[in-house]
Amino acid sequence: MDIYDTQTLGVMVFGGFMVVSAIGIFLVSTFSMKETSYEEALANQRKEMAKTHHQKVEKKKKEKTVEKKGKTKKKEEKPNGKIPDHEPAPNVTILLKDPVRAPAVPVAPTPVQPPVVIAPVATVPAMPQEKLAPSPKDKKKKEKKVAKVEPAVSSVVNSVQVLASKAAILETAPKEVPMVVVPPVGAKAGTPATSTAQGKKAEGAQNQSRKAEGAPNQGKKAEGALNQGKKAEGAQNQGKKVEVAPNQGKKAEGGQNQGKKVEGAQNQGKKAEGTPNQGKKAEGAPNQGKKTDGAPNQGKKSEGAPNQGKKAEGAQNQGKKVEVAPNQGKKAEGGQNQGKKVEGAQNQGKKAEGTPNQGKKAEGAPNQGKKTDGAPNQGKKSEGAPNQGKKVEGAQNQGKKVEGVQNQGKKAEGAQNQGKKAEGTSSQGRKEEGTPNLGKKAEGSPNQGKKVEVVQNQSKKVEGAPNQGKKAEGSQNQGKKTEGASNQGKKVDGAQNQGKKAEGAPNQGKKVEGAQNQGKKAEGTPNQGKKAEGAQNQGKKAEGAPNQGKKAEGAPNQGKKAEGAPNQGKKAEGAPNQGKKAEAAPNQGKKAEGAPNQGKKAEGAPNQGKKAEAAPNQGKKAEGAPNQGKKAEGAPNQGKKAEGAPNQGKKAEGAQNQGKKAEGAPNQGKKADLVANQGTKAEGVAGQGKKAEGAPNQGKKGEGTPNQGKKSEGSPNQGKKVDASANQSKRAESAPIQGKNADMVQSQEAPKQEAPAKKKSGSKKKGEPGPPDSDSPLYLPYKTLVSTVGSMVFNEGEAQRLIEILSEKAGVIQDTWHKATQKGDPVAILKRQLEEKEKLLATEQEDAAVAKSKLREVNKELAAEKAKAAAGEAKVKKQLVAREQEITAVQARIEASYREHVKEVQQLQGKIRTLQEQLENGPNTQLARLQQENSILRDALNQATSQVESKQNTELAKLRQELSKVSKELVEKSEAARQEEQQRKALETKTAALEKQVLQLQASHKESEEALQKRLDEVSRELCRSQTSHASLRADAEKAQEQQQQMAELHSKLQSSEAEVKSKSEELSGLHGQLKEARAENSQLMERIRSIEALLEAGQARDTQDAQASRAEHQARLKELESQVWCLEKEATELKEAVEQQKVKNNDLREKNWKAMEALASAERACEEKLRSLTQAKEESEKQLSLTEAQTKEALLALLPALSSSAPQSYTEWLQELREKGPELLKQRPADTDPSSDLASKLREAEETQNNLQAECDQYRTILAETEGMLKDLQKSVEEEEQVWKAKVSATEEELQKSRVTVKHLEDIVEKLKGELESSEQVREHTSHLEAELEKHMAAASAECQSYAKEVAGLRQLLLESQSQLDAAKSEAQKQSNELALVRQQLSEMKSHVEDGDVAGSPAAPPAEQDPVELKAQLERTEATLEDEQALRRKLTAEFQEAQSSACRLQAELEKLRSTGPLESSAAEEATQLKERLEKEKKLTSDLGHAATKLQELLKTTQEQLAKERDTVKKLQEQLDKTDDSSSKEGTSV
């Protein structure tokens, strides 16, 4: 399903809107159900509507995303138990709730819009959790959105307009590295700190939600200023549910760096409210401990400005679950450093679409992780400003258990940022010595490694620069085991914010080494995704300057083994930002020396793309404005293929931060590469992709300026063995942002190239880069090509193509001519060529047939799919219409129920009021009144007694009148009942008559059905016979055709087989004779044996020993004979196999002979054709010669008339004469010198032509002789081969004859031996064995029969059980219906009791009043029985009508059959009738099944109704008891 399809989008939006509206109505109805007054309920409803304004939008989004991301829902608590109110109007200064102390460290950015509030510097009272005033542009966006989230494409297009004016800001931004409170570069630096950082449900200018359209830094579902927290509304660094200025903790509301529940200035701890750097519950200056208020170095659980601990949440260094402006944790969503699922202005998450920081599917400003949306400092699960560790959330440099001045580790002692056993200046590595931020073994400036002891920013066992990890070495803000700059991950070594094993600038993820915001394995400047490498907001696999990906190492945020300036690598010593052996200015390429962000051989502006030479941050093939998208051309921030100024995508040309194929403002999609937000494979200035090599955002093996790769070494962000300024990748060297395998503007190296300056400080310039051609052919060495070709598997077509390419390369043209000296056999070559061509032809024909069949299938499938699609569309439309109708019906029901509920509430409230009034005017007031009125009542007693008597008389009269009326009604009803009983009896008689008629009709129906069935059976039999005959005829016809074809083949086989049959019949006759002889000998032997046995029996007593010996000898002989027979049989089989093999060989030889003969014939034809052509050429040349001779003769005779051609001479003789007579003739005509000279020249020419022609003739003769010799050689070779083959054939025939003779001989011997071996005992044993087997088979068959019989009996029992179950179910249904009737009767009785309760309650009621109650009960019973009888009548009438209709149908069918007659009725019509009957039977069976299910459902419903009615009976009894009690009380009171 395409998400961006207009239909699906419309359906999704409409469905979401309807769901939200239904939820809203449900909430309203539930909230209004409280037992409060009507006015209070209305007030509560208004409040709830106001509170749930944002929840509607949130729920719509949560249904799509939150279910997938269960981790982020762990701490979605409301801040201080309150729901955020509506947004205030723009340009309104909102005061903080508690007093906030202003930190000395933070500096708020210069505001672009003057009316917006700037970050608090002094203590300011705050309103309770209200969103800060958004910028005017935010207001415009709000007007467009109105709490609705629009799809990603439209957000990109709309955000182009918003960010078009801010392109200049974003172009230069990516070079800078954000520190403590100052918003990160690439974020909208102009936006103020206070107005930024809004929560998840916020809607504002630059921090918009997932599908929102707005300026940079949008929260996941938020629409607000720059840095919005998950549910936070505040400045730049807000926590999860925080609404404060920048840097707020999870539930904090305060300045820029607030902790979890902190509300204060910048860098507040978890529950701290104060200046930057506050501890967990601390309120104070920057760098507070767990409960401390102090300088900027807080310990394990402290959350403060620059140095916050494990769970601290502060301005720039927030940990796992912190959400603060520049430094937000796992679930933080803020301006500069937003967490895993955070989407804010500059740090938007996976599916966020905002200005410059969007994530995997995000299109936005800089600083996007895989699922992270945070400003420049995002770790694996941390999302914070420059200093985020695994679970660290602090200002600049907080370790797990760090306690110190500014971010010291557990055992840290020393000045700024010292390692465990290291002593040096600030920022030294493990064994490093150098300026600030040296690598693992460096000793130097702040930010030292594992065993370094430095003042600021030490982690658990780390003593180094601010925020160093366990194995991390870098500048500020290192994580749990990190050593590096600020904001490092678990084992990150880097400047600020390094990952787990990363060493780089601030803000690295778990294994991230990069500037400020790196992902899990990202290495780059601020705000890197899990595998993202880009400027500030790169996608999954993007690698770029401030935001580098998995193994990227960049300037302030270096990669896994990167060592750079403030965060240098393992053995680096040098000024700030030096590689292992590198010494260079900041941001130099491997061999580049120049401005920041130069490539290997590039000299130019910062941040150039692969083939681009443009402003900073260009894409792979991009040239254009900053931040272009994949194929987009527009404002800044473009995607994958964009070409532009800073932050260009792969091939895109346009504005900043465009989507994959989008053209718009910032907010790019999954694979978009932006300045601050680049996509997966994009390579841009600040945020380029995995295979891109460019400006400060280098790829996996790229080496470039501030964002270096795995083994790069650069000035501020250098790799392990790389020497480059900043941003060098593993083996590539280029200016900013180099890709994995890309050839960049700024000089790449092949993996085997080594440049002279590779491991020396300061690489040298190599000229302005001409963009290399990415589409240029790949040149492989010969060995690798051979190995790869050898290992590959080819098609026939592919192999043919390869052969053609190789032949073209080698310039080989295969000649069909062969010289006499050639070694190869030309006939064999011709054969091979012929076979190859035939194979090729066959394969091509097969391929063509297959392709045609596939085409037909594909066409059929296409048509079927089109039909399916059309049907599916129609179904979907119908479903949509039905759902819309259902939704409207549900809405109407909800509204009606709500109105009823409101009415009931009003009634209840009125009753309560009356009761309250009665209570107020209770017994006290009545006593007073009674005492006052006592005298009046005594005076009026006489009058009252008289009045009471008169009233009683009047009431008695009225009651008697009512009694008379009731008695009359009873009489009328009893008469009506009698009449109805008479009617019922009449109807019963009618029904009995009708039943008789029905039975008669059924009998006639059955007879007609049987007749029809018989006729149908006959017709079906005839049909089957005709079909079988038709099929047999067709089969016979096909067989006949096949037999005709086979006959022709068999005729040829018969002739050959007849000869073989004759020979075999002769052999058989001989064998038969031998068999007869053998049988005769056998019979003789048997007679001899019998006689011998008789003799043996006679002389048993004498010769037992001799007989035993003879028997033993006989058995031994028998065994020997058997072994001989077995051997002979073996030999016979072997000989047969040899004979067969010889036959096969003979056949093969014959086939080869035929092929050789055919090839010879073809060769002879070719030679003959060549001979003919040569003879023709010879004749033509001779004709030309004769013509030239005649012409020369004529010319010479014309010139020299003295020459006489009298006698017929040859041309040579004539020429000799001319030579002899020539001088004489010339002497005779001395005057004619000129013409003679001409003639001489002509003569010479003629001689030359003659010589040439003779030479040609000689050549032709030699060629003819050669060809004749060739032909003779061929004939000889063929004759020799024929002789050889003949000799072989004769030899094989001789061998065959010999083998046949031997076979015959062996067969004779075998038969003789068999005859000797056969005996009667063996035959008897065989028969007995067969009998035993037969008996076994019979026993098995009988057992099987018994098992089958048992199975049949079981099945019958099952059938009977099922029938009994059905009967039981029916009986239960009847019982329950009876019970229902009884319960209804009881109910009616109870009602009558309730109605007559007042009469029963009075003590003076006469016994005559109880009679009408019983009469009413009897009446109701009779009514119930009448209703049941009426229902039965209806059923009977319905059945009778059905029976009549079926009888009518049967009669109509009979009439049709009679009218058509048996002769006219065709087989087809009968077949259709049969089908109809079958269908009817199927329907009947299905109806029976439905009826069974309906019976079960009815049973259930009746049971439920019984239970309900019993409950009602109980309730009524209770009410009766109550009424009885109350009536008795009233009686006593009177």
From Swiss-Prot:
Pfam families per record: Rib_recp_KP_reg
Covalent crosslink: Glycyl lysine isopeptide (Lys-Gly) (interchain with G-Cter in SUMO1): 752
Region 54 X 10 AA tandem repeats of [NASG]-[QL]-[GS]-[KRT]-[KR]-[AVTSEG]-[ED]-[AGVLS]-[ATGSV]-[PQLSA]: start-end pairs: 197-736
InterPro entries for this protein: Rib_rcpt_KP, RRBP1
Cross-link (Glycyl lysine isopeptide (Lys-Gly) (interchain with G-Cter in SUMO2)): 148
Cellular localisation: Endoplasmic reticulum membrane
Membrane topology (Cytoplasmic): 29-1534
Transmembrane segment boundaries: 8-28
Phosphoserine, modified sites: 159, 165, 715, 747, 1032, 1091, 1110
Protein name, as recorded: Ribosome-binding protein 1
Encoding gene per record: RRBP1
